[in-house]
Regions:
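Sterically constrained small-residue positions within well-ordered secondary structures
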Residues: 6, 30-32, 43
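Histidine- and/or cysteine-centered catalytic micro-motif in compact active-site loops
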Residues: 9, 18, 42-44
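Charged, amphipathic alpha-helical segments
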Residues: 17-31
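Short, extreme N-terminal segment that most often corresponds to the first beta-strand
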Residues: 1-16
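Intrinsically disordered, low-complexity boundary segments flanking structured domains
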Residues: 1, 24-28, 39-40
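Short, structured protein-protein interaction patches enriched in aromatics and acidic/basic residues
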Residues: 35-69
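Short secondary-structure junctions and interdomain/linker hinges
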Residues: 30, 34-38, 87, 91
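Mixed-charge, glycine-accented linear interaction segment located at domain edges/termini
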Residues: 67-108
């Protein structure tokens, strides 16, 4: 289980390592382009959602405990990037099977 820390430790949010590794790539790419966006994460206990305004001026940490074992699914990255660029911001969508829906990669 990884941790996303937004601004300060009091704003820590647990996210599974695989999902967090993919979110990290999306956040990194969006901020590299100076494109702030809303990130919505579901509470693990099912009690609702938390929304974070992702912007270059806010310090963030991504603590991924098993990063060496996470294989990146480029199709999932592309799907998450599309969501982050949409009107509702970035929310975690189910991971697509790379082999069922092969598409040309948009990431270079």
């Amino acid at each position: 289980m990884g941790t996303f820390v937004y601004d300060k430790p009091a704003n820590a949010f647990e996210v599974d390592d695989r999902t967090l590794a993919h979110l990290r790539i999306v956040v990194m790419n969006k901020l590299r382009r100076s494109e702030p966006f809303m990130l919505e994460l579901t509470m693990r206990d099912g009690s609702g959602h938390r929304s974070f305004w992702i912007h270059q001026g806010v310090p963030m940490q991504f603590r991924i405990f098993n990063a060496a074992h996470v294989r990146i699914n480029r199709l999932w990255i592309e799907t998450l990037m599309d969501a982050a660029s949409g009107p509702n911001g970035l929310f975690v969508v189910p991971e697509p099977d790379e082999h069922e829906n092969p598409q040309p990669s948009l990431l270079k």
